[in-house]
């Protein structure tokens, strides 16, 4: 496992070339983006970290400094939780798998704890020890269909129960075959870090977008809602708009990363029980929650579980969701029933669940 880990980390430098794409490409392909009509006067900042562009718009006194602080907070988080970053908490846990408990940053511990709760509650539909399988598919760099025998041989290593968290702030992977990949929770956690920076800076309101996750802090003037566009799975345009108050949204969609081999299209949302892309009848799931890390983890879990089996999970974590099915129908949980406005004629609002 460590040999595979070391091979993949050598690709890290190539990711940095994405920064040359320019700010004009930031929204292209984003799962969620904000319609920023908050009365003007906002400070905008676009940076790059965690394999994604980070877009911010911050309002109020000290907005520019707050945006810089939030950007730094996201970079600091990446240096803690990215398995690609040498000596990060996650890289250390992976390298020391099967060994002693490791001291980790409280922020890392909290994210792992949130992720582990979703692993347990979803029955493993979400599993942060998916790394041996996700590295094998290599959707970020050289996506390909692995040999079935290789997938089968690595599946036993996917087992979230091998992650142990202690109250003293330490953590360990009990099996030497285990490895962590927080890609399915990291963008939401980055939104958490940014919003915490806004709170500390005392700004009036702010919005941040990291990959498929959005964090909204504070209220717009006159009680207006924030307008968040949801991507049409078929295009880079908007499917519709969600009107929300402070909170966090994350989308997991099969269109985000995919490749076609021998006439078959494979997406990056892997089912931990099979090692292959999840086939749950969904195109995407957008989850609203009070935590970015939680919304990110839940969106992945719900995509793997499918619509019906997701509902108890969402209720357990007091979260809401928008489901888009392969039949081009849109379902909303009751908390979002009046929050979504459909703008695409290619999809149908099928009701609430």
What are these regions (language model features)?
Residues 2-353:
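Mature catalytic core of soluble alpha/beta enzymes
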């Amino acid at each position: 496992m460590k040999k595979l880990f070391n091979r993949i980390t050598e690709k890290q430098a190539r990711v940095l070339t994405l920064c040359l794409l320019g700010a004009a490409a930031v929204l292209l392909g984003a799962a969620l983006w904000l319609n920023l009509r908050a009365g003007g006067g906002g400070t905008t900042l676009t940076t790059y970290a965690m394999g994604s562009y980070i877009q911010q718009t911050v309002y109020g006194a000290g907005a520019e400094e707050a945006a810089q602080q939030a950007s730094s907070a996201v970079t600091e988080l990446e240096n803690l939780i990215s398995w690609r970053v040498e000596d990060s908490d996650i890289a250390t846990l992976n390298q020391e798998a099967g060994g002693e408990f490791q001291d980790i940053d409280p922020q890392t511990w909290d994210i792992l704890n949130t992720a582990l709760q979703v692993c347990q509650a979803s029955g493993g539909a979400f599993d942060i020890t998916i790394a041996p399988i996700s590295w094998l598919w290599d959707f970020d760099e050289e996506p390909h269909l692995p040999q079935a025998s290789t997938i089968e041989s690595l599946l036993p290593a996917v087992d979230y129960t091998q992650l142990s968290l202690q109250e003293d702030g330490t953590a360990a992977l009990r099996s030497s075959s285990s490895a962590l990949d927080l890609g399915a929770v990291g963008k939401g956690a980055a939104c958490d870090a940014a919003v915490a920076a806004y709170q500390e800076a005392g700004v009036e309101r702010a919005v941040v977008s990291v990959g498929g996750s959005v964090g909204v802090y504070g209220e717009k003037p006159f009680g207006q809602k924030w307008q968040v566009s949801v991507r049409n799975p078929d295009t880079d345009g908007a499917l519709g708009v969600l009107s929300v108050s402070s909170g966090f949204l994350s989308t997991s969609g099969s269109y985000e990363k995919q490749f076609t081999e021998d006439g078959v299209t494979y997406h990056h949302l892997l089912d931990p029980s099979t090692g292959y892309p999840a086939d749950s009848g969904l195109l995407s799931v957008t989850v609203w929650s009070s935590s970015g890390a939680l919304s990110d983890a839940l969106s992945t879990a719900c995509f793997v579980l499918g619509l019906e089996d997701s509902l108890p999970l969402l209720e357990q974590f007091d979260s809401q969701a928008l489901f888009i099915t392969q039949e081009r129908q849109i379902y909303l949980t009751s908390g979002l029933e009046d929050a979504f406005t459909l703008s695409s004629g290619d999809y149908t609002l099928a009701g609430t669940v």
